[in-house]
Amino acid sequence: MDLSGSRDVISSLPDDISSHILSFLPTKEAASTSVLSKKWRYLFAFVPNLDLDDSVYLNPENETEISTSFMDFVDRVLALQGNSPLHKFSLKIGDGIDPVRIIPWINNVLERGVSDLDLHLNLESEFLLPSQVYLCKTLVWLKLRFGLYPTIDVEDVHLPKLKTLYIEATHFEEHGVGLTKLLSGCPMLEDLVLDDISWFIWDFASVSVPTLKRLRFSWQERDEFPKSVLLDTPNLVYLKFTDTVAGKYPKVNLDSLVEAHIDLRLLKPLLINYHQGYGENDMVGNATDFIMRICNVKTLYLSANTLQVLTYSCDAIPIFNNLTHLTIESNPRVGWQSVPGLLKNSPNLETLIFQGLIHKATYRCGDVCLCKKPRKEILSC
């Protein structure tokens, strides 16, 4: 084939199409096109998405060189783009990056009107986000994933367009007060994810957001329990909740809830007593105020842990008049004492799914299975 007459088809494309193509490339490759010609340098300046990850860019043997090279690379990328508008900025860095360099990067993208901001800062030195993050009028989507030391310390919060907030492994300087301040400054918030947030050390935890539609909270440890948890979310339709039973639930407003995934757990010392057969007739903790407020759901997923809670930490199982789909997780260490009452109180149930049938044998499974003699576990029902 004669290629002598071939031409650069991509370079001849209209600028808006070429820029759109660049937006699908990893930032490192997109930035490298700026050396091809003045045109490509101009086009890179208008790439709307930047994804910067120090683990995938440069890999010299010396760790210091990695950090320095990456920091210099970010400086060059932001300089190339100047003040052009930015849609999404994602920054993932580990320890070794100078925190002093990070703040100007964040301020740069905020000043350019970024709408999606994803910060994964796994630092081992003290670091506070610049206050401008909490006063950005253009943010619609904000994800904060921190390591050991970065914390959220807020005074004034005004995020008028923010609809999605994701916070993972993050410490609040003022504990529950800090979370309350943050949420109160998000008048349009619809999606909230709180993952690995140790609110058991707080005096109280409050999620009060009238506009919220979806909430996910996850805390996996069960050595401690939260003192007080308040959920005032009247328009919430989806809830995924993993936590140890709290000391109290002063207010739980879930009137619009349609789908719930619940993994409530007993405190570990109480769980040990339960497994050893102590106090099986005594209630441990009290999840009644929480459980009673999810009775409007149509779709419900219950973990094996939650079956324990229904048995030993709930005054009564509410009537689930709207429930049509129920999924129950099984575990060989957990009995089904609460299952008969749960099924009896679900008069409109259409679909029942058991994720595993192995469970701890007890005398109180009622007519839900064939557990007649208590053995270590029942293989099937």
Swiss-Prot record:
Entry-linked SUPFAM superfamilies: F-box domain (SSF81383), RNI-like (SSF52047)
Position of the signal peptide: none
Lineage top rank: taxon: Eukaryota
Pfam families: F-box, LRR_At5g56370
CDD domains: F-box_AtFBL13-like (cd22160)
Keywords: Leucine-rich repeat, Repeat
Record domain F-box: where: 7-60
Disulfide bonds: none
The keyword Transcription is assigned to this record: no
Ranges for the LRR repeats: 118-146, 171-196, 218-243, 249-274, 299-330, 331-356
Name of the protein in question: F-box/LRR-repeat protein At4g14103
Phylogenetic lineage: Eukaryota, Viridiplantae, Streptophyta, Embryophyta, Tracheophyta
